[in-house]
Amino acid sequence: MEKIITTKDVHLYYGSKEALKGITLDFPDKGIHALIGPSGCGKSTYLRTLNRMNDMIENVKIEGEFKFKNQNIYDEKIDLVELRKKIGMVFQQPNPFPFSIYDNVTYGLRMAGIKDKRILDEKVETSLKQAAIWEEVKDNLNKNALALSGGQQQRICIARVLAVAPEVILLDEPTSALDPISTEKIEEMLLTLRDNYTCIMVTHNMQQASRISDTTSFFLSGNLVESNKTKKIFLNPDKEQTADYLSGKFG
C-alpha cells in the first residue's frame, strides 16, 4: 500500500529532555490512523512534527527523516503555508475565528487569493457538507462562529481545513472537549472522509480508536511500542505493554 507520510528515527528534544526516542512510523494513503497512549507519552508531540507545528516552540530540536509524498517536510526551502494546506490540523479545543461561519470556511481560500464569490460559495457548501454541519447552519452563514456550540465549532474548524483541499488531516484529540452526541457526529463524519483523506488522530478514547480507525499506533514514554491494523492491536497485540495498557493496568 502506498505511503503518504513516512518518518524514520525521529527524535525530539525540549531543551535537554528527549520527548521522542527514535520513532519510525509510516502512514498509508487514505484511512483513519489512531495514535494512542497515556498522557505525556509523546503522541501529540509526534503528531505536530508532521506539519511542523513544533517549529513554533522555543528550544525544540528535531532529528530524523520526515517525508510527505517523498518530499522532505523539513526542507529549508519548503513553503510552510502550502505544507499546512496539504497537511491540515484540527486541535483539541475548537478554535474558530471570531467572525462569520462563511468567513471562517473561506479564510484559507481568500488568503490564497481566491475572490470569485461563486467559487467561494461552492467551497463553503461542499466543505460544510463534508463536515456534516451544512444542514444546521446553511440558513445562518453570517452568524458568528463563536456563537455555535462546541461540537458545531469543531465541525466548522474541520470544514475550514477541508476547504483548502488537504490530503492529510491531523486531529489532536478532536472530541475530548465535546459531549457524547457531538463526539458521535464527528466520528460519523470522519468515517465518511476516510476514503478520500488520510486522517491521523491522537485519542485517549480507546473505544473511539477501536470504533473508527484502520490502524493504531501505541506510544509509551516517547517510544513507539507497536503499530498495526486496529483489530490486531486490540484483539491480539504483539507487545505485553500494549496489552497491559488496553486492559487498564496503567495509563
From Swiss-Prot:
Keywords carried by this UniProt record: ATP-binding, Cell membrane, Membrane, Nucleotide-binding, Phosphate transport, Translocase, Transport
Chief localisation class: membrane
One Gene Ontology term, aspect cellular component: plasma membrane
InterPro entries in the cross-refs: AAA+_ATPase, ABC_transporter-like_ATP-bd, ABC_transporter-like_CS, P-loop_NTPase, PstB-like
Highest taxon of source: Bacteria
Example of a GO MF term: ATP hydrolysis activity
Residues involved in ATP binding: G37, P38, S39, G40, C41, G42, K43, S44
Enzyme class: translocase
Subunit structure: The complex is composed of two ATP-binding proteins (PstB), two transmembrane proteins (PstC and PstA) and a solute-binding protein (PstS).
Domain ABC transporter: 5-246
PROSITE patterns assigned: ABC_TRANSPORTER_1, ABC_TRANSPORTER_2, PSTB
Localisation per UniProt entry: Cell membrane
Keyword hit for Transport: yes
GO BP terms in the entry: phosphate ion transmembrane transport
Family statement: Belongs to the ABC transporter superfamily. Phosphate importer (TC 3.A.1.7) family.
Function of the molecule: Part of the ABC transporter complex PstSACB involved in phosphate import. Responsible for energy coupling to the transport system.
EC number: 7.3.2.1
Membrane topology: Peripheral membrane protein
Protein name (database record): Phosphate import ATP-binding protein PstB 2
Catalytic activity, reaction form: phosphate(out) + ATP + H2O = ADP + 2 phosphate(in) + H(+)
